[in-house]
Amino acid sequence: MTTSSATTPLKQIICIKWGTKYGADYVNKLYGMVSRNITPPFRFVCFTDNTDGIRPEVECQDLPIIDYPMPVGTTGQWPKSRLWSEKLGNVTGNVLFLDLDVVIVGNIDVFFEYEPNHPVVLTRNMTNPLEKLGQTSLFRFPVGALAPLQKLFASDPQGIAEKY
C-alpha cells in the first residue's frame, strides 16, 4: 500500500522471496504486519521469482540478476546478496529489508529514524551478541551502497560463505 503525504518521507520496505520454502502467504502476512505497524506513507516491494497469490498492495518486482553461483552446503541465506546490487529494479534511496519470517509486534518507524546519516544499519545477532557480524533479518541501507560487498562476494561466493 502506498499512501502519499507532502510532508512525510516515503518509507520503503523490501523483502525477497525465491524458490518454494516460503509461499505467498508469508509475503501477505508480512505486508499486513507492516501496514499495521508503520506511519504512512510507505511502499512495500517484494523481489520474487513467483508472484502467484501475493496480495495486490504488494509491489512485486523480478529478482535482481546475479552472475555468480550461490554457495552450497553453507549456512546463511546467500540469495539475499542479490539485494546488494547497484540497482534494485525501480527502487532508489533508503530501504528497510525484512525477512519473510519476522514477526512485527510494534511500530517500525524507529528503523527509519535511527542513525539517519549512517549508510547501513544492521540488527545485532541476539543468539550471539558478542559477535561482530550483524544479523540480516532486518537491515536498512541505501540502494547501491552494498554494491562493493556484492562485488567482493561475487569474487569467491563459496569461500566467503564458508568463512562467514
Write out the residue ranges for each language-model feature.
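Glycosyltransferase catalytic domains, chiefly GT-A lineage
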Residues: 1-164
